[in-house]
């Protein structure tokens, strides 16, 4: 009976996680989040059962040695922890997906009260403890056990869903997350590596960089590449900027349709699904070359599944779980008892996948075009500047942006060394840029600059500076010129880029973004807290 009661209460305690894993997902969540893997389901089911078992053993030992006061305190905490399911109301679960107005109303009403629920638990425990000390404890234990038995049928619901998902586990690992390397022919033509670092800000990285921040790899690259001091992105949000960059035309998001986006061309004002729009990968494959993509945020693999020889997409944030069993257990326990660090851990995991698991694979497989979309230096802050390594426990202050920039610099260094080790550094065209600048830079120094880095290293490794304004929207056409062997040297690249700058800002960008609402923010239909990137 003891195990059943505690099993029921622990199961209820983890209701927010059950809802997160099994709740009906919105179109937006489906688009932004990879399908959970089997490990996540095993992790949650095992965590609830093992924690219940451990608590039961603990309680049995307390009763065995007749520690009445400890038993009372134990039941106080167990009873008070039932406040946690209130947090369920903050989650966009099935019932709220059917009634969006209720979802937004509940979130707006509870966000100021529910968030510090752990503090509320402590207050309730303190008050209850005082009352119980003055009265008998038998009634407390009786009521808690009665409530546990009343809620026990929910175990059947949660674990019934769990076993149902595991039974149909074949659909959990799909092309939504990964497209495995195909049998590709050896490509001996031009090779382009395109790196996008999310929210990298030109002004703060180069013009106004703090004196104590050293970025040796970026500074070194600046001396052997084409360097633009006035490059502007096509949009100010990842959800629109990346489709614009990959298609070579400015787009705004109309809506999210499960695994795809409906986009509007801001020049022709026509609407199309992202998968149907011409993109750099399709054009490169039409030239007979090969393509690879590894990136976070967007639902790349289903969108470009016929245009890529290799694809690995990574979670956009809070809805995701770690791919390993123990990693998922850590995420679940951390969120329940300490802090919700899923976003930080997702970012760290993303970098691990890109830099240590996918980098060698994409380079060694000799792809003609490799596209990498890194989550840093976008928040959350995940780099410990003192210890020089990633950590999910970094102080949330604007100054920590530069910690993430140190991580960017390390990644560029690792990328260079990998290319050099494979004999590709002096044979490849390397493009480093960003989808947008740091939107919250005003929190750091009260300034906002829309410029992003735009660095192009040609095979000959010559340094040149372009000071004329240019839109990074030209990147797609530039890559095609390289793949066609019409551009192969730094001089040819500079000449082509300067020619493109003559049309700026026609069809490339509007400065500032506020001149056009659709270029300022994603569609109002989207939840801004989850859609922005």
Where are each of the predicted segments found?
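Catalytic domains that recognize anionic headgroups
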Residues: 1-533
């Amino acid at each position: 009976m003891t195990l059943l009661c505690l099993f029921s209460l622990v199961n209820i305690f983890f209701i927010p996680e059950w809802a997160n894993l099994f709740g009906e997902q919105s179109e937006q969540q489906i688009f932004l989040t990879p399908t959970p893997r089997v490990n996540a389901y095993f992790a949650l089911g095992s965590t609830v059962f093992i924690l219940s078992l451990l608590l039961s053993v603990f309680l049995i030992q307390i009763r065995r040695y007749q520690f009445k006061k400890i038993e009372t305190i134990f039941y106080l905490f167990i009873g008070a922890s039932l406040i946690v399911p209130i947090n369920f109301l903050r989650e966009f679960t099935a019932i709220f997906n059917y009634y969006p107005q209720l979802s937004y109303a509940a979130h707006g009403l509870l966000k100021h009260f529910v968030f510090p629920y752990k503090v509320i638990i402590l207050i309730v425990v303190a008050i209850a403890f005082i009352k119980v000390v003055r009265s008998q404890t038998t009634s407390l234990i009786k009521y808690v056990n009665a409530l546990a038995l009343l809620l026990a049928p929910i175990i059947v619901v949660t674990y019934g869903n769990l076993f149902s998902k595991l039974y149909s586990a074949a659909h959990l690992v799909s092309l939504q997350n990964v497209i495995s390397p195909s049998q590709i022919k050896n490509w001996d033509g031009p090779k382009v590596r395109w790196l996008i670092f999310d929210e990298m800000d030109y002004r703060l990285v180069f013009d106004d960089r703090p004196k104590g921040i050293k970025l040796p790899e970026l500074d070194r690259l600046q001396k052997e590449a084409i360097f633009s001091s006035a490059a502007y992105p096509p949009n100010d949000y990842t959800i629109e900027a990346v489709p614009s960059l990959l298609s070579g035309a400015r787009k705004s998001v109309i809506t999210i349709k499960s695994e795809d986006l409906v986009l509007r061309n801001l020049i022709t004002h026509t609407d199309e699904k992202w998968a149907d729009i011409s993109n750099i990968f399709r054009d490169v494959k039409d030239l007979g070359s090969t393509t690879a993509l590894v990136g976070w945020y967007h639902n790349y693999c289903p969108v470009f599944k016929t245009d890529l020889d290799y694809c690995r997409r990574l979670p956009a944030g809070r809805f995701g779980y770690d791919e390993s069993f123990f990693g998922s257990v850590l995420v679940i326990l951390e969120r329940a008892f300490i802090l919700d660090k899923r976003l930080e851990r997702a970012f760290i995991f993303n970098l691990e996948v890109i830099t240590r698991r996918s980098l060698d694979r994409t380079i060694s497989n000799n792809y003609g075009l490799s596209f990498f979309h890194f989550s840093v230096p976008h928040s959350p802050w995940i780099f410990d500047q003192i210890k020089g390594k990633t950590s999910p426990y970094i102080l949330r202050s604007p100054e920590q942006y530069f910690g993430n920039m140190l991580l960017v610099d390390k990644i560029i260094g690792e990328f260079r060394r990998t290319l050099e080790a494979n004999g590709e550094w002096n044979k490849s065209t390397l493009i480093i840029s960003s989808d947008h600048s740091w939107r919250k830079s005003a929190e750091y120094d009260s300034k906002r600059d829309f410029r992003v880095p735009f660095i192009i290293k040609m095979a000959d490794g010559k340094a040149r500076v372009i000071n004329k304004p240019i839109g990074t929207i030209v990147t797609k056409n530039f890559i095609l010129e390289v793949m066609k062997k019409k551009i192969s040297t730094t001089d040819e690249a500079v000449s082509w880029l300067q020619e493109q700058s003559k049309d700026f800002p026609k069809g490339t960008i509007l400065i500032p973004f506020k001149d056009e609402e659709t270029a300022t923010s994603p569609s109002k239909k989207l939840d801004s807290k989850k859609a922005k990137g």
